[in-house]
Regions:
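Pre-Walker A adenine-sensing motif
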Residues: 1-16
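Interdomain motor-coupling "hinge/lid" segment immediately C-terminal to the ATP-binding subdomain
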Residues: 125-232, 236-237
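Conserved catalytic/switch belt of AAA+ P-loop NTPases
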Residues: 92-116, 130
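Domain-level recognition of nuclease-like catalytic cores that cleave nucleotide substrates
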Residues: 399-419
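Short glycine-rich substrate-engagement loop in P-loop NTPases that contacts/grips substrate
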Residues: 48-79
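Hydrophobic positions on the alpha1 helix immediately C-terminal to the Walker A/P-loop
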Residues: 35, 39
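Accessory nucleic acid-recognition modules appended to NTPase machines
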Residues: 188-361
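Conserved lysine of the Walker
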Residues: 32
Length: 419
């Protein structure tokens, strides 16, 4: 696979202009190392590309852990890239000291000194993140978006929020092709068999090795089973007691272990939308996995077979695909919006809500069928009535090819608007 320009690159370069430390986190194998090494060429360090060091190397890890300040000052104030930084927790306090000294000496020119990467969500590790409040910009790199994987520029989420559906085209890529490609860079072009082998190794290395490095879990062997159970529940409201019971854990432990999977960027939660609107709303998050192909692997299904023989599961996979696309595109772009789901206690629901900082909201429903009718807007119309003037519009994403209006700011739009 040739190097694909990642859509988050401008955000990283912009952050390096203003922040002394930029932390790029994300799951293992999302392409962080490749990306930061490409950026290193544009980060001059005494005329050369910025040095790149990875703490996966035992000697460098020993140095960073036992003499963190010496490790950092050894670069004499030049920009440096440090990969897998969560492996050396001692570095974070040392970074604070080194950055504060640089700010005292250099003022604004202390920006862009450290570009860090890590495979665990730094915000879930407050002991590490707290010393660097106000000194560090945090960005997240996910697996390929649909647009990245099909060599297009970004912009799907912007089009949705503007209700700009002119010239929506699949550009010759089928929905199934795109779901398979919008995955981890290493397996974009891999065969079904090679993907299976890769995912087996990937899950083992994260759940057996990486988790041990940041957390002491008594029943670590149950994590793969927990991940598989969550794969059967994608798009469902998360009930921690129920999930824990199925895995064989107490409710408290189950919730904690689910937090670990989220921290390693294997799963994600979509929070419930809430506002004082005079209706009782469900207050639990919906759960998804970070990669739709990973779900198929865990359930031992080929996605093409699922589409033909298991319509219910295929609907859940499509919802997972849209959830991850929205999360990835929000992470990559400057669009300011939060992702939620909407569900009332009497069962009226909308799959996704995008809320802008000004309170304006877009409702998105996912439908696997190739046609749309007015009934598919039922939940969206209830939501529209509740939010009134804050309603931007409602979109039903579906498997057909035509954009069609269904009322004032209500649209049926092909999935291909995402790529």
């Amino acid at each position: 696979l040739k190097y694909l320009d990642r859509h988050i690159t401008p955000r990283i370069k912009e952050a390096l202009k203003f922040s002394p430390i930029v932390f790029l986190n994300g799951a293992r194998q999302t392409g962080k190392s490749t990306l930061v090494q490409a950026i290193a060429k544009d980060l001059p360090s005494g005329g050369d590309p910025a040095p790149y060091v990875t703490l996966d190397r035992p000697v460098l890890l020993a140095s960073a852990s036992s003499a963190p300040e010496a490790f950092l000052t050894g670069y004499h104030g030049r920009p440096v890239i440090i990969d897998e930084v969560q492996l050396a927790p001692a570095l974070f306090r040392a970074l604070k000291i080194v950055v504060d000294e640089a700010r005292t000496k250099e003022g604004d020119s202390a920006s862009g000194k450290f570009l860090l990467t890590g495979s665990a969500n730094i915000l879930a590790l407050p002991k590490l993140a707290d010393p660097l409040v106000g000194r560090m910009a945090i960005l997240t790199l996910y697996p390929f978006t649909a647009a990245e994987a099909t060599y297009n520029i970004s912009g799907g989420i912007e089009r949705l929020l503007r209700l700009d559906f002119k010239n929506v085209s699949d550009r010759g890529f089928s929905l199934m092709d795109v779901i398979k490609k919008a995955t981890f860079p290493e397996i974009v072009e891999a065969s079904v068999e090679n993907r299976r082998t890769w995912f087996d190794g990937y899950i083992t290395s994260i759940l057996q090795r990486d988790v041990r490095q940041i957390s002491e879990l008594e029943k670590i062997s149950l994590l793969p089973h927990l991940l598989s159970v969550l794969a059967t529940r994608v798009g469902g409201v998360m009930n921690d007691a129920d999930i824990a019971r199925e895995v064989g854990l107490s409710s408290v432990t189950g919730k904690s272990y689910r937090g670990i999977l989220k921290m390693m960027f294997l799963t994600l939660d979509v929070k419930p939308w809430h506002r004082n609107v005079g209706k009782r709303l469900v207050k639990s998050a919906k759960g998804y996995l970070i990669d739709t192909n990973l779900i198929c692997h865990l359930l031992d299904y080929n996605i093409d077979d699922v589409a033909l023989t298991k319509p219910g599961l295929f609907g859940s996979l499509l919802e997972n695909f849209v959830a991850t696309e929205l999360v990835k595109q929000l992470s990559n772009s400057d669009v300011k919006a939060e992702l939620y789901h909407f569900r009332t206690s009497d069962g009226i629901e909308v799959d996704f809500i995008l809320e802008r900082p000004d309170g304006s909201v877009l409702a998105i429903e996912v439908k696997k069928a190739e046609t749309v009718n007015m009934g598919d807007f039922k939940g969206i119309k209830v939501f529209q009535e509740l939010v009134g003037k804050d309603f931007i519009g409602g979109v039903v994403l579906y498997s057909g090819k035509d954009v069609a209006p269904f009322g004032n700011n209500l649209w049926a739009v092909p999935f291909s608007v995402l790529w």
